[in-house]
């Protein structure tokens, strides 16, 4: 399992993002990650959190992860968020879920001209990279997310961070939650709502 959190703000999103992700720490014990977009473009950090909590691993990265929009995750599986450059532009992506027809989708990607995927231990492909490959088969992020949800058998909720904003897509059967919160000058999207309700000034949309 895992959880994700995203923030779009008129001012710095970094601390809200940091604490929002940290509130999901009970959902995963292997990897944590943050990606932000600011004046310098995209910045990202991923750490192993098997032997120490998210907060202590990422506290030292916060000065470098400065921006007004960001996404991040706690993951029990793959390292993420990923940074991607495609015909849609540069973006960051993080996911929560399971792809049951992974082998079929990978085979189709090769047949359609997708050159390669980065292989992980024991021959696994990062599921988030596969989702990005599906999105990139279409001509817009909206169409790409709809296409990915249509093709994936299983359950997959997705956050995509672009220079223009954050796209959030709940898995099409509603098995996993995606909730939206707000405070003055900022919106957030979260796997679990207490991640923003526990932060002062935030409420449901």
Regions found by a protein language model. Give the residues of each.
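Conserved short alpha-helical segments that host acidic/polar catalytic motifs at enzyme active sites
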Residues: 1-202
């Amino acid at each position: 399992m895992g959880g994700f959190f995203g923030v779009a703000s008129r001012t710095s999103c970094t601390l809200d993002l940091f604490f929002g992700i940290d509130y999901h720490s009970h959902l995963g014990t292997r990897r944590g990650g943050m990606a932000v977009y600011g004046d310098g473009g995209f910045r990202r950090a991923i750490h192993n959190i098997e032997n120490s909590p998210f907060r202590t691993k990422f506290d030292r990265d916060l000065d470098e992860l400065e921006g007004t929009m960001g996404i991040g995750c706690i993951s029990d599986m793959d390292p993420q968020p990923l940074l991607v450059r495609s015909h849609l532009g540069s973006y960051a992506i993080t996911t929560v879920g399971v792809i049951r027809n992974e082998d079929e989708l990978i085979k189709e990607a090769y047949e359609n001209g997708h050159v390669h995927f980065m292989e992980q231990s024991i021959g696994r492909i990062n599921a988030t990279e596969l989702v990005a490959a599906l999105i990139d088969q279409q001509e817009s992020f909206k169409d790409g997310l709809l296409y990915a949800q249509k093709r994936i058998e299983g359950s997959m909720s997705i956050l995509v961070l672009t220079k223009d904003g954050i796209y959030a897509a709940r898995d099409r059967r509603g098995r996993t939650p995606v909730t939206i919160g707000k405070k003055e000058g900022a919106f957030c999207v979260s796997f679990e709502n207490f991640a923003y309700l526990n932060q002062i000034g935030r409420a449901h949309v």
